[in-house]
Amino acid sequence: MTDATDTNTPPELPVALRPLAEYASVQTWLDGLKQHWGGDPATDDPERLPMLEAFCGYANRDPDQIIKETTMIKDGEKRIRLKGRERYSKLIDGWQATIEGSRIRKGKAGNTVRSFLIHNGVLLASGMQG
C-alpha cells in the first residue's frame, strides 16, 4: 500500500523556465495565433505569456514538456495522449480556480492555456469554470 506522504520519493524540484519565446511549442502557439488573428500575439495581449508562465509553474512543467506529455507520434502522425490531455484539463481547471479576480478573469486565464494546447494539436473543451 502506498501512502500519499511516502518519504521515499524525493520532492520534485521546481521547473526552471527559460524565456517562453525560446520554446518550440510557444512559437507554434504564437505563430498559430498570428495566422488566425493577425498582429503580434506576443504583445497584443500583455497577459498572454505571463499567464502561460504562471500555469507552467503551477504544473511544474515547461511548455515543451506539457506538449510532450499530451501528444505522441504514432504511425508517423501526431496523436493525443488521452491520459495526458485529461490530466492537463484537470490541472487547468484547478489552476484557474486559484486565479484572483472575477469569473471572466479566471476564464481568460484558463482559456489562454487551452489556446496554447489547442494550437499545439491538443484539443480541449473551452470553459468558464470558476
Language model region names:
Residues 2-36, 118-129:
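N-terminal DNA-binding module of tyrosine recombinases/phage integrases
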Residues 39-124:
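Non-catalytic DNA-binding core/recognition domains of DNA-processing enzymes
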